[in-house]
Each structure stands twice: as structure tokens, then as C-alpha cells.
């Protein structure tokens, strides 16, 4: 189940739970991953080396109207739960007269931190469809908020799901999408006589130099795509025994 910020919980069927866990059973060997929400949209293609992730690079907006109810959707790039809380507070203040401010978010290159919130709508009719759109676009580091202004006519469970899903999709589609690299930091200390060898390895590995210190003991801090980090460490360590 998902536990909402307001104490609300979203329950999933046994079949949904099986789908959530299934993408990782094929290649989890040395470590365990948390349940994945791929059952709520198009399944995510598993990548052994997670060097890239998809996110949005700006705000997207969408509006959907059904039976006089208006759904205003906003997609935001985010990096932390703290930032999400600030944005939610701002939207609740801006739309103080709205009936519901529902949302879902996904965080982290591995898409391991996520939450959905129905904000008083019937269980699983708002937050879950919003999260499904985030997942079907394979996005992370994103918050989607859908504000509902009630039009006086009940939409029913099916109507609510369609409305929140459609509004979320419109906001996401109107946001600029980008792919970003997942990088890891590698630090190495060495005597000055090893300088040429170290710089040769850095160049061959296509690592980025973040910082250097060439005083008594030389130190270098590098950034490299995650899949090449261990290989870089091994090459640098071998220089010490060369």
C-alpha cells in the first residue's frame, strides 16, 4: 500500500503487487530493490547499468474539463521531498477554494521513492492514475499536481480516474523532457611521481575532473558515469602497484 501525507492509504490487489515486484526478479542478485510501480503504466525497460534517467526540464500545464468539473494539472521537475512539500503548500495556498489538490511524485535515478495522494477523492481514483502517467512516460524527479474545482456533478469512480489521468498526461506532455546521466564521484590520492599515469587513466576513462590538490600529497576528485566507476577505481589503484 501507499501511505499518503494525510494519513490516507492506497491499497493494491495481489495481482498488482505481483506486477510491481516482477521487473526485478530477473536480475536482482546481490542487493534488493524496493517494490517498483511499473504496474501503474507501461512496464519500465530494465537496464543493468543505470547511466541515464528521464525527467522534465521545466514546468508543464494542462487543463481538462468534465461535467463542469475543472482539473488543472501542473508538472514540476523536483529533486527532494522538501522541495515537493514547498510546491504543494504553494498550490494549496494558490487554489485555496479548490475541492481537491491531488498529486503524485517519483524521485531518484532508480525511481525508488514515490508517493500518490488522493486528497479526499475515493481511494485510487486520483493519485494512482497520476502516478501511472509518470510511470508510463518513464520519468523520475517529477511532481505532478492536479487541482480539481468541483462542478456540482459527481463523475463516479471511472470518470475520476479518466479525468485525473488525462489532466496529468496533458501536463507531462507539455513539459520539456530530457535525459540526464547518473554519475558517481571517484576520489584518489597519489604521489606526484604518478601524475602522468593518473592523468592518462583519467583521459582514457573520459572522467570529468571536479577538483584537484597538488600540494604535499596529490588528490583528485572525478565524476564518471556509474557503469564505469568501478573500472576507473581499479585502474587508478593498479597504478599504485605498477
Predicted regions and their residues:
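Active-site beta-strand/loop microenvironment that shapes enzyme catalytic pockets
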Residues: 126-174
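Short amphipathic alpha-helix segments
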Residues: 189-207
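C-terminal regulatory domains involved in ligand/effector binding and gene-expression control
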Residues: 48-125, 229
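A common structural junction motif
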Residues: 95-98, 205-210, 237-242
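Short glycine-/aliphatic-rich beta-strand segments at the starts of folded cytosolic domains
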Residues: 177-192
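Terminal, non-globular segments
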Residues: 222-231
Amino acid at each position: 500500500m501507499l501511505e499518503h501525507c494525510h494519513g490516507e492509504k492506497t491499497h493494491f490487489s495481489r495481482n498488482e503487487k505481483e506486477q510491481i515486484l516482477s521487473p526485478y526478479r530477473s536480475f536482482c542478485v546481490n542487493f534488493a530493490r524496493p517494490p517498483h510501480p511499473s504496474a501503474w503504466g507501461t512496464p519500465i525497460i530494465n537496464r543493468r547499468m543505470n547511466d541515464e534517467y528521464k525527467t522534465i526540464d521545466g514546468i508543464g500545464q494542462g487543463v481538462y474539463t468534465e461535467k463542469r468539473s475543472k482539473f488543472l494539472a501542473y508538472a514540476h521537475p523536483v529533486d527532494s521531498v522538501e522541495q515537493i512539500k514547498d510546491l504543494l503548500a504553494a498550490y494549496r495556498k494558490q487554489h485555496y477554494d479548490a475541492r481537491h489538490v491531488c498529486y503524485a511524485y517519483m524521485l531518484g535515478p532508480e525511481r525508488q521513492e514515490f508517493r500518490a495522494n488522493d486528497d479526499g477523492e475515493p481511494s485510487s481514483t486520483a493519485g494512482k492514475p497520476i502516478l501511472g502517467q509518470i510511470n508510463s512516460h518513464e520519468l523520475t524527479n517529477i511532481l505532478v499536481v492536479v487541482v480539481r474545482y468541483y462542478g456540482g456533478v459527481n463523475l463516479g469512480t471511472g470518470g475520476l480516474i479518466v479525468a485525473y489521468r488525462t489532466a496529468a498526461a496533458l501536463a507531462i506532455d507539455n513539459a520539456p523532457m530530457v535525459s540526464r546521466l547518473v554519475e558517481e564521484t571517484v576520489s584518489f590520492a597519489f604521489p606526484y611521481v604518478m601524475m602522468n599515469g593518473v592523468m592518462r587513466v583519467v583521459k582514457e576513462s573520459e572522467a570529468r575532473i571536479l577538483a584537484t590538490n597538488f600540494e604535499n600529497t596529490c588528490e583528485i576528485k572525478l565524476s564518471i558515469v556509474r557503469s564505469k566507476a568501478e573500472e576507473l577505481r581499479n585502474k587508478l589503484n593498479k597504478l599504485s602497484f605498477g
